Amino acid sequence: MKLKVCGMKYVENIQQVAELQPDYLGFIFYEKSKRNFEGIIPEFSNSIKKTGVFVNEYIEIVISLVEEYRLDAIQLHGDETVAYIKELKCQLESSRELKIEENKQIKKKKNQHYISKNDVEVIKVFGIKDEFNFDVLKPYLEVVDYFLFDTKGKERGGNGTKFDWSVLEKYPFDTPFFLSGGIGLEDVEEVKKIMKSNLPIYALDVNSKFESKPGVKRIEDLKEFKESVISSETK
């Protein structure tokens, strides 16, 4: 089971969370969010995947931020269509090929473009409350790496409330997904229970329930959660 900590905002806090070695760190690039990220992402382990969270953003802007911040994953939290994702992936590949070609022309290594060894992962978010029609996911199966199921609410994520996880019992696909939406320390036993199910849960996504204020994560609480849920899985 992987762990993603989303809504990172402040340099010192980012470094502290990174020391806990989550698998993903999420940075929200959405001006309407209280956790909108601007500035510099500090250096941390390459094993942690930098994830950019976008909401109905222009593809050109997504591409530019992927390149600027060397993002490993893109989380689409809006109404992005299959056509949008296909075009996004096409432009990502074109950008990658262009950089490879340009690097061949640049003799000094320090001036060469950074090129990720892996393709950028695409995570598509869907909101759930008391019920969900999983048929809407079918067209996305061929274009995403993962789904992320969050609580349908007023905000685009970070609402701090859980949806009815029993809805997921009807999930009919093999595509792995992130489980999100108001997960906190008080949910450890419930999380352990759903982890034992046959559902293809790839990762847990946590955010507001571990904050002292928007964008600032409580390190000790995250450490306890990781040790209780993620680490216990291997024992």
Over which residues does each language-model region extend?
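Intrinsic disorder/low-complexity segments
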Residues: C90-D119, E233-K235
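Conserved N-terminal beta1-alpha1 strand-loop-helix module at the mouth
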Residues: M1-K89, S116-F173, F178-E233
